[in-house]
Design a protein with these regions (language model features):
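Structured C-terminal subdomain patch of bacterial secreted/periplasmic proteins
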Residues: 16-43, 129-171
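Loop/turn-rich, solvent-exposed surfaces of beta-rich toroidal or solenoidal domains
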Residues: 70-74, 114, 124-135, 139
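Basic- and aromatic-lined ligand-binding clefts that recognize polyanionic substrates
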Residues: 41-95
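Loop/turn elements at helix/coil->beta-strand transitions in domains of secreted/extracellular proteins
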Residues: 7-12, 32, 63-69, 95-98, ...
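His/Asp/Glu-enriched short active-site or ligand-binding loop at hydrolase and phosphoryl-transfer sites
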Residues: 88-108, 128-131, 162
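Active-site rim elements
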Residues: 76-79, 100-105, 166-171
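Extracytoplasmic/secreted envelope proteins and their assembly/folding machinery
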Residues: 4, 26-33, 42-46, 50-53, ...
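Internal alpha/beta domain cores that form substrate/cofactor-binding pockets in large enzymes
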Residues: 1-28, 99-106, 110-120, 140-146
Length: 171
């Protein structure tokens, strides 16, 4: 930061990662728009996203049976999951799902051991995995990374929702 200060380059904090709602996170597009001289376009784009999001959210708001979902995966000896008050938890709820960590008070990531996730997520209907996998991702690749993954109901029923960050610029 010192070099940037010496060159009189202003630093602007980017706090999007602190957002606890998907729309709050998406609204940061307005800040990006300001920096590149496209504030009006960014505001229009956000308004469209907000309208579509709220329309889809309303469609599932009265759903009685909500599919269960768990999230994350093991990295070394730790399973990383979004906290129960994170924007991912809100996204799952707004999409009509019952997130396995919904009662957790954390807004960021939570570190868990395999046994705890297994006990809570074993029978979940869906499993969300997001990582940067080189190559073509498959159930076999997921199983190869940890053979115990094949025991989860969502794996057995082929209901893993996968986002490859190598292909999709989510962040």
């Amino acid at each position: 930061y010192e070099v940037m200060k010496e060159l009189n380059i202003p630093l602007v904090p980017y706090w999007a990662f602190k957002e606890t709602s998907p729309l709050g996170l998406s609204e940061w597009i307005k800040v990006a728009g300001m920096f590149i001289g496209k504030e009006e376009e960014a505001c229009q784009l956000f308004a469209q996203m907000e309208q579509r999001y709220n329309l889809l959210k309303a469609k599932v708001s009265n759903v009685k049976q909500r599919p269960s979902v768990f999230s994350g995966e093991m990295r070394r000896d730790t399973w990383y999951v979004p906290g129960g008050q994170s924007f991912y938890a809100r996204l799952f709820a707004d999409a009509g799902a019952d997130y396995f960590m919904k009662d957790n008070p954390e807004t960021g990531g939570v570190l868990m051991d395999f046994e705890t996730v297994y006990a809570q997520g074993y029978n979940a209907g869906y499993w969300r995995v997001m990582n940067g996998y080189k190559g073509e991702f498959s159930y076999e690749a997921l199983k190869a990374s940890n053979p115990q993954y094949a025991d989860f109901r969502a794996f057995k029923e082929k209901k893993v929702i996968y986002c490859n960050l190598e292909w999709i610029p989510l962040y």
